[in-house]
């Protein structure tokens, strides 16, 4: 299992719209759910900086994640254009081997089934 980690610095005042795009019910997450390898994601906002976010996506394997990116490139490009107006800076933190997976519950967790677990 892999964890793909992204960091975003969102433009002041754009947080709510950014959260709609990347949150557990957001368009980005809905697109990821189309892949059988997508296990879920955790979406986090920094306590010390309301414009800094992390997105951690969990995928079954790298090869299927890469196939997802290729298969949905057109939709991903459109979502990235939306994101560009909301984000000042984005950093691909990296792809990690997931040694321990969250309990898959809570307000930030989104899973493949399409429902958020509380």
Residue ranges and their predicted role:
Residues 11-13, 38, 92, 104, ...:
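Intrinsically disordered, low-complexity segments enriched in small/polar residues
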Residues 23-40, 58-96, 118:
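An amphipathic, aromatic/His-enriched active-site/gating alpha helix that lines ligand/cofactor pockets
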Residues 2-9, 39-70:
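Short, well-ordered beta-strand segments in beta-rich or mixed alpha/beta enzyme
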């Amino acid at each position: 299992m892999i964890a793909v980690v992204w960091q975003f610095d969102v433009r002041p005042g754009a947080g709510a719209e950014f959260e709609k795009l990347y949150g557990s019910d957001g368009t980005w997450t809905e697109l990821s759910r189309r892949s059988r390898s997508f296990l879920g994601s955790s979406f986090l906002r920094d306590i010390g900086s309301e414009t800094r976010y992390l997105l951690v996506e969990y995928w079954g394997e790298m090869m299927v994640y890469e196939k997802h990116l290729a298969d949905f490139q057109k939709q991903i490009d459109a979502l990235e254009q939306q994101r560009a107006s909301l984000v000042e800076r984005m950093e691909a933190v990296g792809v990690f081997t997931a040694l321990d997976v969250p309990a898959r519950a809570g307000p930030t967790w989104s899973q493949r089934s399409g429902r958020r677990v509380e």
